[in-house]
A protein has these predicted regions:
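Short acidic, hydrophobic short linear motifs in intrinsically disordered regions
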Residues: 293-296, 305-318, 345-353, 528-540
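Conserved short loop/turn motifs at secondary-structure junctions
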Residues: 57, 137-138, 213-217, 298-307, ...
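Phosphate-backbone binding and catalysis cores of DNA-processing enzymes
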Residues: 74, 121-300, 405-467
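Core structural elements
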Residues: 193-203, 221, 251-253, 301-313, ...
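Helical mechanochemical/support elements of P-loop NTPase systems and associated helical scaffolds
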Residues: 68, 72, 114-125, 138-149, ...
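Intrinsically disordered, low-complexity regulatory segments
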Residues: 2, 39-194, 203, 263-264, ...
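C-terminal accessory/connector segments of nucleic-acid motor ATPases
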Residues: 239-260, 291-332, 670-674, 722
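Basic, low-complexity terminal or inter-domain segments flanking catalytic cores
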Residues: 2, 22, 26, 30, ...
Length: 838
């Protein structure tokens, strides 16, 4: 009976428990389902707000830039949806090579971080579209973007490629009316370049981490550009100056002063003066005596205008005339190309596509320009037939692209003044003037050259006046402009003395004249080749065939960002790290570092684009040789981390040891030779002569919380940190923080950290209680849209420098913030001081 009763009780209890459990489970499930449903609904709502799917018939146009999309949308109007991809949407993965070198070079392309939503948005719009027009830029990168978008949309839709070299209503409509197929060969060319860059960078960089220091990198093109600056530095250091002399005097006739200069012992052969005694003897021979005029030569010289801008020439002239870096030039040009809001004309693209090596002008633009020149300057300034220019290295006058030019002669620099920012106005005027001058008539210059004789020694002087200015009325290239200001002759091979104002008085053969200021000798020393500046390094890369015009700005930025090159007095100087890495790469990878090899790759890429050679063959040929070189370098490249370089500088701490240069994980530093008995270390730098200067310690603004002594700012594998100066006696170590309180928890500050991939981020020190973190450096600047207390710094090729709210993504142009204004004022001051010194 007891057993039966217990059994019944157990059954009842089990039933009740099961019932309760089922109820609880049902409640939990219902709760979870409700949450999921709410999330989905919210997500859909957000998506609709972000960009609802339009109803009705429409065609879809995909471009790569939001500002370009905005301009084009206004041109096309109803019946079109325009969306931006914000640059590339797919690339090789960051976590692995992404290229199967064993299996026919299959490539693993993945969506770029943060682009998933953008891809989904394009796919959603594509579903309802009748026709899809892909309109990224007309270069290889633009073609790659178009192919990647087409792959994500799929083959079920009608997809066309549209290309235009100007963001104007006429150009865009013409492109839409005349669509073309996607260019597979051009895409193959871009893929080849990307894979070659990945193979070189991904395979060589780890060897440098092991042998030199972590975090540095090699690149197929950037390393060759580094070689240019490094070898120029070697030339400068090896240069031995040589003494030489010149003899100058001054004459004056009819109240016109002019300078004369020693030429030689005959009127036909120039004599270089290298002997001081010989020079002094000539000065003594002619002193107090008359100079007889032996010959007066007068000739009319014609000077031709130069072509409109290519990318490289624009970068060079903007550097020489405006003081712009290549990067700054391209950022400003990008905005002028994509569209500027004009008060009386709405959104307008003001210049044609700015990445080009063509000097061609479209026939309709050429016709408009000739009409403009005749109307504004008169028929004397217009040549009888258009000036024709050939692309460098080509016999063709015609090619598919155009030079950089204004899109419309309606928008004169004066017309758009007030609508453009200062940098935009300067660059637009430069492009405008160069374009107009390229189709103007020749300048005619009357030149006079006079030869004098005194005691068997010959002297010369020259003067010139502009008889007809022609194209010089509008534009003169930087080099010619400087020569013109000096009163000199910008295209004469011989450097001759000249009249200061360009004029000579009336001088006749057989006439004798005395010196107003007696001839005297001047001592000179030959100079080493100059270090590269922005203009000359772009010119050198173009002449050597290194990279493409569209890549020059990023190449120059890369070698600076990597710490291989620094800018001193507006010239590029390789750092110690840059010199070391360059020499090691040249020794271990002679083919990759060969300028001719890099130029040869560019030719192969052109052949792939023309369909003359298969892209996989190029990769196979490269890899078969490169793989062998890689294995050899792993074994034979020197390990700098194990080397000690004595400096001859006594240790400041123990005064007994000597500082040695050592290589650590973060570069070179000075360490006492008595280590471990003395742990004194210092950062240092070398000046241009190679002298070592010990840098003062960098102290943090707060004291050590443990012992009260100063905290030193140090650099480690994961970025900067602070450590007590009394280390190792006091082992206090803290993160490097910015003086900005976290707006989320209002307790922590933002600490600077570096990820395992070398990228910096800023996280709250109150972690894990507060997980606030930013990939961009925070600034204490209230967001104008949502009021959030900080904004993050960002810089992109298309939009330039900005502060962006991490919450609502609202953006403010950097130049409109107090930080940007302070930076601009500092930069302006530096540029003015450079101009004054030059």
């Amino acid at each position: 009976v007891a057993k039966k009763a217990a059994k019944k009780t157990a059954k009842k209890t089990a039933k009740k428990t099961a019932k309760k459990t089922a109820k609880k489970t049902a409640k939990k499930t219902a709760k979870k389902t409700a949450k999921k449903t709410a999330k989905k609904t919210a997500s859909k709502t957000v998506k609709k707000k972000a960009g609802s799917i339009p109803s009705g018939d429409y065609d879809l146009v995909v471009v790569e830039s939001p500002s370009k999309a905005k301009t084009i949308k206004k041109y096309l109007g109803k019946g079109y949806q325009v969306v931006a991809s914000n640059g590339h949407i797919k690339d090789l993965p960051k976590s692995k090579l992404g290229v199967d070198v064993k299996e026919n070079f299959e490539i693993d392309l993945v969506p770029i971080t943060g682009k998933k939503d953008k891809i989904e948005r394009i796919q959603e719009l594509a579903k309802g579209a009748n026709i899809i027009y892909l309109a990224p830029d007309m270069d290889r990168e633009g073609e790659a973007i178009a192919h990647h978008i087409a792959e994500e949309i799929g083959k079920k839709k009608k997809i066309y490629r549209v290309v235009f070299n100007a963001v104007t209503k006429a150009a865009v409509n013409h492109a839409i009316e005349n669509p073309v197929e996607l260019n597979r060969h051009m895409y193959d060319s871009q893929k080849t370049r990307r894979v070659l860059d990945r193979l070189v960078g991904y395979k060589i960089s780890p060897i440098l981490w092991d042998k030199v220091q972590r975090g540095i990198s090699a690149g197929r093109v950037q390393s060759v550009a580094l070689r240019l600056t490094s070898e120029r530095e070697d030339e400068i250091k090896a240069f031995v100056p040589e003494q030489w002399f010149s003899i100058h005097g001054e004459m004056n006739k009819d109240k016109t002063a002019f300078e004369f200069k020693y030429y030689g012992e005959s009127a036909s052969k120039k004599n270089d003066l290298t002997d001081e005694e010989e020079t002094k003897k000539i000065v003594k021979d002619v002193k107090g005596k008359e100079y007889k005029i032996k010959e007066v030569k007068k000739r009319e010289r014609k000077q031709n205008p130069t072509p409109p801008f290519t990318t490289s020439k624009l970068q060079q002239e903007a550097a020489n005339k405006l003081g712009f870096t290549a990067k700054r030039t391209m950022m400003v040009a990008q905005k002028l190309y994509e569209g500027i809001q004009l008060r009386d004309h709405g959104m307008q693209g003001l210049i044609t596509y700015m990445r080009t090596d063509s000097v061609r002008i479209a026939p309709e633009s050429l016709s408009s320009l000739r009409e403009f020149i005749q109307k504004k300057y008169g028929k004397d300034y217009l040549p009888s037939s258009p000036n024709e220019y050939k692309k460098k290295g080509s016999n063709k006058v015609q090619d598919a692209h155009e030079a950089i030019r204004p899109t419309s002669l309606t928008f004169t620099p004066d017309e758009v003044r007030g609508d453009l920012e200062p940098d935009q106005q300067k660059l637009y005027e430069l492009i405008w003037n160069k374009f107009v001058s390229s189709q103007m008539g020749q300048a005619i210059i009357d030149q006079t050259s006079v030869t004098f004789e005194n005691s068997g020694h010959f002297f010369k002087c020259s003067g010139s006046i502009i008889k007809f200015p022609g194209f010089r009325t509008v534009y003169l290239e930087a080099a010619a402009e400087k020569a013109s200001k000096r009163g000199g002759n910008d295209d004469e091979d011989e450097i001759q003395a000249s009249a200061k104002a360009g004029l000579l008085p009336e001088l006749k053969e057989g006439e004798s004249i005395k010196a107003f200021k007696e001839a005297k000798e001047l001592e000179h020393w030959t100079s080493p080749p100059p270090r590269y500046n922005e203009a000359s390094i772009v010119k050198e890369m173009e002449e050597q065939g290194i990279g493409r015009p569209s890549t020059y700005a990023s190449i120059i930025s890369n070698i600076q960002d990597r710490g291989y090159v620094e800018k001193i007095e507006n010239r590029f100087v390789p750092t110690e790290l840059g010199q070391v890495v360059c020499k090691m790469l040249v020794q271990s990878f002679p083919d990759v570092m060969n300028v001719k090899f890099t130029a040869g790759v560019e030719e192969l890429l052109d052949k792939i684009e023309e369909g003359e050679i298969g892209w996989k063959k190029v990769l196979k040929d490269f890899w078969s040789k490169f793989e062998v070189t890689l294995e050899k370098a792993k074994e034979e490249m020197k390990n700098l981390k194990k080397q000690l370089i004595p400096t001859g500088i006594n240790c400041k701490k123990c005064e007994d040891g000597e500082y040695h240069i050592k290589w650590g994980r973060n570069g070179q530093f000075l360490a006492c030779s008595n280590y471990p008995d003395c742990n004194s270390t210092h950062d240092f730098k070398k000046d241009l002569e190679g002298t070592i200067h010990i840098l003062p310690k960098n102290y943090f603004h707060d004291p050590c919380p443990t012992c009260g002594k100063r905290l030193e700012v140090k650099t480690g594998r994961y970025g900067r940190f602070v450590r007590c100066e009394d280390y190792p006696h006091c082992e206090t170590t803290l993160p490097y923080t910015l003086p900005i309180v976290c707006p989320d928890c209002k307790i922590g500050k933002f600490a600077e950290k570096k990820s395992r991939y070398g990228k910096y981020f800023y996280g709250c020190t109150n972690y894990p209680e507060c997980t606030n973190a930013l990939w961009s450096r925070p600034y204490k600047n209230d967001c104008p849209s949502c009021g959030y207390a900080i904004m993050g710094y960002r810089e992109t090729k298309r939009e330039g420098k900005q502060l962006q709210c991490p919450k609502c993504k609202f953006k403010v142009d950097w130049e409109d913030t107090k930080f940007g204004k302070e930076e601009a004022a500092k930069q302006k001051s530096e540029e003015e001081s450079v101009k004054e010194s030059s």
